[in-house]
A protein has these predicted regions:
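Glycan-recognition and catalytic cores of secretory/periplasmic carbohydrate-active enzymes
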Residues: 1-267
């Protein structure tokens, strides 16, 4: 039996809310409340999830847990103010980990490469900051997310491809991680919708979706049993999920391509 994990619980909360909105069944709402209470019990007085998180490490991608809790808070009026206060406590701690150039410390899902986090977990963190800032109507969280998102968009548009990891000076290393690319594309889409003058976000999103589509439909992906699947690394022998086709990579790509389709229909 594996111990519960804060980040994984946040992912489940997203799914349970979608199920609750679709079915209206109270069991999902009741389960979500129990899960949220448990998550907040892992938050310390400084705003860190200091217990029961992945590897026992203190990390900033708890923002991606806070965001769905804020969405759920709209269904729990009695808890809303307390949950928002706890959310701010965590988000404020995350901002203490962000440098002036928008790079985030304590953002990797390993110990030995925490000094140069993967874009997969960077994207989780920035997306959570942006959504939480939007839900709380607090520009400081949104601006922190936009700053990091724009830095990575510039890197991508200049080079045509992102590295898999970036250090505190935004120097890249290792192979591109398509999962993180898809996640960033989702974030760039949100930013472009919120600010029509953020042309960089619209351009980066569109270019990334083209790149991901090419990767997912070329080479080995012409075989029927893996057609359309997005690989862990590009090239495939990169260090993240080497020679693998992780389901979450394809999931985020599908989300991003659906955004692209909706954007095209709207414009």
């Amino acid at each position: 039996k594996r111990d519960s994990v804060v980040f994984n619980t946040g992912q489940i909360l997203r799914g349970m809310r979608a199920l609750y909105l679709f079915t209206g069944e109270e069991v999902y709402k009741e389960s979500a409340h129990r899960a949220i209470v448990w998550v907040w019990n892992q938050l310390d007085t400084e705003g860190k999830f200091s217990s029961n998180d992945f590897m026992g490490a203190v990390r900033v991608y708890g923002t991606y847990v806070v965001a769905p809790i804020l969405e759920w808070s709209q269904h729990f009026e009695a808890d809303k103010d307390a949950w928002e206060a706890k959310a701010r406590l965590h988000l404020d701690w995350v901002l203490t980990q962000q440098q002036d150039n928008f790079w985030l410390a304590n953002c990797d899902n390993t110990e030995h490469k925490n000094h140069k986090p993967i874009i997969h977990t960077v994207a989780y963190t920035l997306d959570g900051l942006f959504d939480a800032g939007s839900l709380l109507q607090d520009e400081k969280y949104k601006n922190a997310a936009i700053g990091g998102a724009e830095m990575l968009a510039q890197k991508f548009l200049e080079r045509g491809l992102l590295h898999g990891r970036y250090d505190k000076r935004w120097h890249g290393s290792e192979a591109f991680i398509p999962t993180g690319g898809a996640q960033l594309s989702i974030l760039w889409h949100k930013i472009a919708r919120a600010d029509t003058k953020a042309y960089w976000a619209e351009e980066a999103r569109g270019s990334m979706n083209v790149l991901l589509s090419v990767i997912a439909t070329s080479g080995a992906r012409t075989a029927p049993d893996v057609g359309g699947a997005l690989q862990g690394s590009f090239p495939m022998w990169g260090r993240y999920e080497s020679f693998g086709l992780p389901n979450w990579a394809t999931k985020y790509m599908v989300d991003s391509l659906m955004n692209e389709l909706n954007w095209s229909n709207e414009h």
